[in-house]
């Protein structure tokens, strides 16, 4: 593997304009802001970034802009959310010559799902044809992979190097940590980052990190330093923010939280609605509790 990404890895929001196009010049300000907060890596094109709405050209351009903005300061992970092995491979090939540390790949996520052998074959073909490290993004409710199946895939396909575990059940997370001790296990259980870290998570890739990167890095650092009193305090404040942003329009609520902390205002891609006035009020209050409202604006380079 080119690099083993660990620590706090925020999944970026994609900066859409009102006409639905990506405003690529606003990628760099977000990358710089997240790195400035102490983030250890960057993920683009995932669910927080509405990667499922991007066509192949947009996907390639977004990844290129993210890699260019990162300038090698932190590893970049490329999300892939598509419905077929063919399209997943195509996206992987679009970015394999960029400075991408790994692919973050969801299982196919339409109403029906492949059986276990077909799922193993899906990730095997991706690995064989892209030659890139793969992190399974275990998030799709109707195509959810058990710890046993995840472990089987990682054992049979060496380029599958880890899992981003996104269920709220810490028992599943703990089982996976125990069954795959030599693999990279990331938490995407936004409400439970603190216990995930104490269980030994290698890092996190979750929307809460993009909504409050400074506090999220502080939580990681506190657990690593053994300062559990401070970690618990941060956990409670971050949980209040998570409760404010978690909703069907989570990407919009995440980008609204970012805008309150200085990033340029951007939009979700239609038909996803923006944060409602009620959501905005609760998000603002939670960020105030974190001391995250600085009023400093982040400007895009011309």
Give each language-model segment a name.
Residues 2-10, 14-142, 152-154, 297:
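Active-site beta->alpha loop and helix N-cap motifs at the rims of alpha/beta catalytic domains
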Residues 4, 9-13, 37-39, 198-201, ...:
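C-terminal alpha-helical cap/extension of soluble enzyme domains
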Residues 9, 27, 59, 63, ...:
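A general structural signal for well-ordered alpha-helical segments in protein cores
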Residues 54-57, 90, 115-118, 147-149, ...:
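Short secondary-structure transition/capping segments
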Residues 68-74, 98-99, 129-132, 155-159, ...:
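Short helix-capping segments at alpha-helix termini
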């Amino acid at each position: 593997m080119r690099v083993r990404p660990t620590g706090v890895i925020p999944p970026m929001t994609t900066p859409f304009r009102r006409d639905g196009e990506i405003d690529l010049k606003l990628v760099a300000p977000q990358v710089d802001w997240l790195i400035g907060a102490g983030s250890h890596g960057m993920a683009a094109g995932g669910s927080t970034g509405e990667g499922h709405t991007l066509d192949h050209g947009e996907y390639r351009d977004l990844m290129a802009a993210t890699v260019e903005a990162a300038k090698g300061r932190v590893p970049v992970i490329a999300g892939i959310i598509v419905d077929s092995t063919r399209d997943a491979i195509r996206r992987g090939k679009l970015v394999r010559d960029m400075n991408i540390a790994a692919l973050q790949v969801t299982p196919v996520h339409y109403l029906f799902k492949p059986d276990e052998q077909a799922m193993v074959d899906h990730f095997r073909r991706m690995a064989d044809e892209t030659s890139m490290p793969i992190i399974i993004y275990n998030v799709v409710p109707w195509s959810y992979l058990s710890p046993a199946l995840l472990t089987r895939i990682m054992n049979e396909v060496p380029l599958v190097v880890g899992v981003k575990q996104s269920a709220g059940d810490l028992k599943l997370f703990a089982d996976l940590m125990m069954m795959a001790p030599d693999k990279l296990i990331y938490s995407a259980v936004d409400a439970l980052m603190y216990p995930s870290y104490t269980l030994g998570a290698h890092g996190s890739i979750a929307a809460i990190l993009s909504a409050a990167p400074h506090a999220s890095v502080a939580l990681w650092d506190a657990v690593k330093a053994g300062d559990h009193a401070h970690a618990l305090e941060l956990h409670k404040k971050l949980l209040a923010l998570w409760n404010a942003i978690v909703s069907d329009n989570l990407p919009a609520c995440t980008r609204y939280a970012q805008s309150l902390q200085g990033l340029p205002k951007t939009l979700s891609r239609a038909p996803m609605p923006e944060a409602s006035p009620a959501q905005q009020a609760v998000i603002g209050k939670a960020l105030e509790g974190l001391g995250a409202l600085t009023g400093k604006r982040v400007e895009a380079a011309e």
